[in-house]
Amino acid sequence: MNKYPLLSLINSPDDLRLLSKDKLPQLCQELRSYLLESVSQSSGHLASGLGTVELTVALHYVFKTPFDQLLWDVGHQAYPHKILTGRRDKMSTIRQKGGLHPFPWREESEFDVLSVGHSSTSISAGLGIAIAAQKENLGRKTICVIGDGAITAGMAFEALNHAGSVHTDMLVILNDNEMSISENVGALNNHLARLLSGSIYSTLRESGKKILSGLPPIKEFVKKTEEHVKGFVSPVGTLFEQLGFNYIGPIDGHNIHELISTLKNMQSLSGPQFLHIKTKKGKGYAPAEKDPIGFHGVPKFDHKLGELPKSSTTPTYSQIFGSWLCEIAVQDEKLIGITPAMREGSGMVEFSQQFPQQYFDVAIAEQHAVTFAAGLAIAGYKPVVAIYSTFLQRAYDQLIHDVAIQNLPVLFAIDRAGIVGADGQTHQGAFDLSFMRCIPNLVIMTPSNENECRQMLYTGYKCGKPAAVRYPRGNAIGVKLEPLAELPLGKSKLIRQGKNIAILNFGTLLSEATKVAEDLDATVVDMRFVKPLDTQRIQEIAQTHSLIVTLEENAIQGGAGSAVAETLYQQQQKVSLLQLGLPDNFIPQGTQKEMLAELKLNAEGIFEQIKQFLQKI
């Protein structure tokens, strides 16, 4: 820590608040350098945190955290917060098994008020916390930091609308890192922000409201004049004013002294406050400033070279999906690809560039994405919604009400199904089979490799009804890709004929199942479909084997194994059943390999679980 003389002194925000203001620019420089060095050695989210260094320092300098409650939305930008709140020396463990959590996490620190991972939750939770503090007359402040992407979600605006109507004391900070700040405009904004957040303006504003409340024409004139002055710099402010907030900004989010002055002024204001700051994602590190998307989440890399390591030559399942999408779009101009702000992650970059008229990024709006797709299907188009398993949870009602009930031909390409690795509890794709399996009209497919994935996507595209294909994060296994052809709905595939024991596989654990089967001389069936289920195959297997093992990378409760159990019960089959899958707890971070081993879903673990079960029967 010799390179970081000031940062090495900061073990909590109390230490930070002992520094004089003239030391803060140096601290910000050290914090940014330390963040870059630590993340490059451990992997993690980089660009967002580089852009919030000054904001983080200013917030902990002005507010008395943890008494004052600071909430970070999503959490990608909270690495500097972790460093300043006693976790500096553990940053090398972030996102690793047993290490620091990738996002703010209540169990990890008293400074983490809200556990996060999904976007747009901070204002709703913050309002609840603020109202509780107001009811108990605690005198504590509530501050929510939300990004320009997360604030586009409907939930954020629902919360803003509520907060403005109840007029509770809280501060919402919009971290807008869409573009760099113009120096001239920034200076004007900073000056205006000091005026608008100052006590004189605040007193005049509140007094004026009372005095002019009985004089509508004059009141309206004053209001419009005020908004015109603000709108000269930021027309967006009018929107938040209409929602009931006192809007300040935009100001330079990298000017530590201006941030502190504005925050100190706003600290004394009553009612809902809204501060709009402009930051640059990747600030202070040229490669990240140039490519903020590429440096959003990074593997281990040499930060001195500024180059990210090249990925494997084997395509990911996301890339397999993207290639399939392009292949079909050439033939069918009515194919429409939809993503809720996950173009890169879902493998849709090439598709968006080659077929811009058939591509829609609806922003962080999963509910809208699904019902938008329903509308396209009603109009005769063929929508494909590319969505992570964990984010499909946010559109469950739309999946049922707007797609399935109307039996509309919408295809769901469900990425990151199963264990996702380093992002932990909030991002595991553990529940999609369970929450989809009970929905009528929905076809659900689980590919075992990339060729099966392509065929299932094509089958879902052609079947004329709601369909879902769920596939994992990471690289495919390198099998040969065959010409596209529709699969017969609800029909499984025999992989290996054995005796006594049969493994019914759902998904990409098939390679592990076949390894186990060699040692046990077991039958292996790639079930392919969770719905409709191949009940005929299950009946045949039950009549010729003494033990059926179901294998899936989904919660055991309500998953594919449960579907098999229900079928065996309905058929009144006398056969033992072992259901293997994800346990009834939220699964923490770790690599996919580490977590599958811990959950005993690799070949060794599957073999062990079967042998232990055999000893009981």
From Swiss-Prot:
GO terms for biological process: 1-deoxy-D-xylulose 5-phosphate biosynthetic process; isopentenyl diphosphate biosynthetic process, methylerythritol 4-phosphate pathway; terpenoid biosynthetic process; thiamine biosynthetic process. One of its GO terms (cellular component) is cytosol. Its EC number is 2.2.1.7. Thiamine diphosphate binds at H76, G117, H118, S119, G149, A150, N177, Y285, E366. Mg(2+) binds at D148, N177. InterPro entries: Dxylulose-5-P_synthase, THDP-binding, Transketo_C/PFOR_II, Transketolase-like_Pyr-bd, Transketolase_BS, Transketolase_C, Transketolase_CS. Binds 1 Mg(2+) ion per subunit. Binds 1 thiamine pyrophosphate per subunit. It is an enzyme of class 2 (transferase). It comes from the Bacteria. It catalyses: D-glyceraldehyde 3-phosphate + pyruvate + H(+) = 1-deoxy-D-xylulose 5-phosphate + CO2. Its cofactor is Mg(2+); thiamine diphosphate. Belongs to the transketolase family. DXPS subfamily. Catalyzes the acyloin condensation reaction between C atoms 2 and 3 of pyruvate and glyceraldehyde 3-phosphate to yield 1-deoxy-D-xylulose-5-phosphate (DXP). Homodimer. This is 1-deoxy-D-xylulose-5-phosphate synthase.
